[in-house]
Design a protein with these regions (language model features):
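Predominant activation on well-ordered alpha-helical scaffold segments within soluble catalytic domains
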Residues: 17-18, 44, 48, 100-108, ...
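A glycine-rich helix N-cap at a beta->alpha junction
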Residues: 141-160
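Acidic, glycine-rich active-site loops and adjacent beta-strand->loop/helix elements
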Residues: 85-87, 124-132
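Conserved small/polar residues in nucleotide/adenosyl-binding loops
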Residues: 163-169
Length: 172
């Protein structure tokens, strides 16, 4: 195979982005999909469906981050690619979703071409990456990277507008 043959399906990638951008419409063509709200749950379910259709095994960690794993030839640490599906209160249409869905398109392209990688690939959707609901931003990725302790992260105060919810009860 030449490098010219290793090409993503741009139409499929665009259609996937546009389908996800229909969930949580905001103002001026943007999105409003705050972490762990109904619209976030809806796009997460769609992402999970797409990943499973691509042959990935989807797991969710204690912070609610999603990991869609495509196995490799060897049992090695995975290559992670992704971003987030949540948005700011008035978020951009492509912020975050492009990183997550580009990872999914990589997996789909490898599948289309019958390529098995040496290492597993995991497409990640980090929970609360934007930090619009729970401070600080990137708290779930921070727990994963060892920057924050899990108990500390789960004890983050809930914003006033969501006083009936807490991060631990939402993640469960």
């Amino acid at each position: 195979m030449t490098t010219n043959q290793l090409q993503a399906n741009g139409d499929r990638f665009w259609d996937t982005i546009e389908a996800s951008a229909q969930i949580g419409p905001g103002v001026a063509g943007g999105l409003r999909r705050l972490a762990l709200t109904d619209s976030d749950a809806e796009v997460r379910a769609l992402f999970r469906q797409w990943c499973e259709e691509a042959g990935c095994t989807v797991t969710i960690d204690q912070m609610g981050s999603m990991f869609a794993r495509r196995d490799g030839r060897e049992d090695l640490p995975p290559v992670l690619v992704g971003s987030h599906l949540d948005t700011q209160i008035a978020g951009g249409r492509y912020d975050g979703i492009v990183g997550v869905l580009a990872g999914l398109e990589i997996v789909r392209t490898l599948n289309d071409l019958g390529i098995t990688t040496k290492r597993p690939i995991e497409v990640v959707n980090w929970t609360n990456e934007e930090g619009a609901r729970f401070q600080p931003p990137m708290v779930a990725a921070g727990v994963f990277a060892g920057v924050y302790e899990l108990d500390w992260a789960l004890a983050r105060p809930t914003p006033v507008s969501y006083t009936h919810l807490t991060l631990p009860t939402i993640v469960r």
